[in-house]
Amino acid sequence: MNHFPWLTIIVVLPIFAGSLIFFLPHRGNRVIFWYTICISILELLLTTYAFCYHFQSDDPLIQLVEDYKWIDFFDFHWRLGIDGLSIGPILLTGFITTLATLAARPVTRDARLFHFLMLVMYSGQIGLFSCRDLLLFFLMWEFELIPVYLLLSMWGGKKRLYSATKFILYTAGGSVFLLMGALGIGLYGSNEPTFNLEILANQSYPVALERIFYIGFFIAFAVKLPIIPLHTWLPDTHGEAHYSTCMLLAGILLKMGAYGLVRINMELLSHAHSLFSPWLMIVGAMQIIYAASTSLGQRNLKKRIAYSSVSHMGFLIIGIGSITDIGLDGALLQIISHGFIGAALFFLAGTTYDRIRLVYLDEMGGIAIPMPKIFTMFSIFSMASLALPGMSGFVTEFIVFFGLITSPKYLLMAKILIPFVMAIGIILTPIYSLSMSRQMFYGYKIFNAPNSYFLDSGPRELFLSISIFLPILGIGLYPDFVLSLSVDKVEVILSNSFDR
């Protein structure tokens, strides 16, 4: 066990420091904004330091372990630890949350509560990625929903209450299955209940019961990922939310579902996963085509980007279903890659709306001339989204594609049909992406508006965009920097789990 509680400090610091926001002197929103920025940067630096000096990337075992007994009655522990699967999402969470806080500077209404909720969300996400107790996993899963619901319902568009209600109904409904599965696994087959993921990973179940557990967990994670047909909350939520909230939703929240699918469904229920993996491949391929086709018909800019996120999650599902080292590595890399790309696109969509006050694509046009910097940045991130070689999107899709081709589990016909469907999705992506850019930036429609003078992006927007672009380019040119964090853990998951 680690003697210094690094992870506990990292999890608790944002919410503890955030609670002090309400005691800051009333000297305007600037003090609150810079205080939140400093806390976010401090948290990111602390996380980076702990991982650089106390984490061994070539060790697949759980590291920085902390285990404190919380409720003795049913063996509930505050049990934390990280490995190759969790270090990437944790660092992504710190990076995106810091940038989303910087993006939230225009927020002036109830600024104290807004920034407090962002820090609470920060703690919940870090806690979920670092917990090693199944019941604690559920508590973090639920705890993180509260600030998201309040951020959606209080800041956003005219239909924000509708979208927030839809979000909480979907996610709370999925959480019921997560709780039932956690209690079922924790209480099964032993005199003393345990929720320790280390013990549960070595436990075996009857085939029928394991399938039931798998389906329950899958429904919970499918809502958050999201997987069709449980995705309909996402476009409405993104369409109404403030863009800093959208950055957190697209960059981190969706990845929680993918993380749970690997951490619980693959690690704990490996036999059932091998049985259901062909269906995952089919669902992933259908999702790529369906979401890309639906995105093309969206008038709302943010809803079009939201459907593109759903489409890209299809590649992640296929990587998880391939049951190969390469495919799972590609899926984990897609978690990081899309976290950056999705956050960047929603940020630029939000800054564009702040300037022109238009959200429907058929009302836009000609923005490239008055706002060339935003045009350039949006074009670059659109290229990253459609998997331009040299950027992270291309690498992740290629690795997932290669992982499917080399999988020994599937017949030749499946290795032909699924990549064929994936290729159609890859063709559809530039169609809706370039169509979006054409409607926004070309033509003369915007000059007919009463106020045809618009400010281009300032230093804050440029800094944010460059900060997100550099990791996208870095992963695209040298993906092994990220893959090296998880490659040993992926090998252990597949060798230990599927050879039992």
From Swiss-Prot:
EC numbers on record: 7.1.1.-
Record's bilayer topology term: Multi-pass membrane protein
| Catalytic activity reported | a plastoquinone + NADH + (n+1) H(+)(in) = a plastoquinol + NAD(+) + n H(+)(out); a plastoquinone + NADPH + (n+1) H(+)(in) = a plastoquinol + NADP(+) + n H(+)(out)
Q: Which organism is it from?
A: Jasminum nudiflorum (Winter jasmine)
What NCBIfam families does this protein map onto?
Answer: NDH_I_M (TIGR01972)
Q: State the family named in the UniProt similarity comment for this chain.
A: Belongs to the complex I subunit 4 family.
This protein's UniProt keywords: Chloroplast, Membrane, NAD, NADP, Plastid, Plastoquinone, Quinone, Thylakoid, Translocase, Transmembrane, Transmembrane helix
Q: Which gene encodes it?
A: ndhD
- What name appears for this protein in its UniProt entry? NAD(P)H-quinone oxidoreductase chain 4, chloroplastic
